[in-house]
UniProtKB/Swiss-Prot annotation:
Stretches with biased composition (Basic and acidic residues): 241-252
Reaction(s) catalysed by this chain's protein: guanosine(37) in tRNA + S-adenosyl-L-methionine = N(1)-methylguanosine(37) in tRNA + S-adenosyl-L-homocysteine + H(+)
Family: Belongs to the RNA methyltransferase TrmD family.
Protein name: tRNA (guanine-N(1)-)-methyltransferase
Function: Specifically methylates guanosine-37 in various tRNAs.
Compartments, as annotated in UniProt: Cytoplasm
Amino acid sequence: MTWRATVLTLFPEMFPGPLGVSLAGRGLAAGLWALEARDIRDSATDRHRSVDDTPAGGGPGMVLRADVLAAAIDAADPVPGRPRLVMSPRGRPLTQARVAELAAGPGPLIVCGRFEGIDQRVIDARNLEEVSIGDYVLSGGEIAALALIDACVRLLPGVMGKLDSSAEESFSAGLLEYPQYTRPKSFEGRPIPEILTSGDHAKVAAWRQAEAEALTRARRPDLWAARSVARPAANAPAKGESQKTPKNKTDG
């Protein structure tokens, strides 16, 4: 069965957007995954195709109506079983682990909110999982949905050109990715670290692991703490070893 993402949106013309180019686009054209963007307004019942109304209790903006959105969900997903997501800044943070779960399934139905939000009753009645891609507010859920789909699609078989590529990137092993270098060998007086051109694969692997751990400790202490809980022995410093972040030879 082909992995399929179904998106409910007021702006279906935003899809596939950037998902139609590069690796994701080639995979889409080759049938490695599928995308369906459905207009929420198609489920409106009045002649104006209204989808929103003023907030109960007062306040600024408009709220997506529960009846219209429920009808759109039921039409797109008549037999519940797929993950049903709604992109929301108040949702649980999207993680690489959750992305891997979604990529391993049939593909999600994703609701893209607009205005002040969505009537809570449809979130509860249709069991929508609220998902956030960060602590900031966007104009709507479409950009967040594109990011989520892209993260999933690149894990699908055949989409990535090199099988190891996704496994070695940030978050895949609970760590940020190590620094990358390529030609020229020297750039503005900054050389590629010698160990990367040594041809010693074991030393290269050890260097990359150390750099990934150092970056994670320095930039994402939350990830490092979670990894340390899961793998205390692996992350404990050796006797007499400091926790200082190692410097590249290019750091001065």
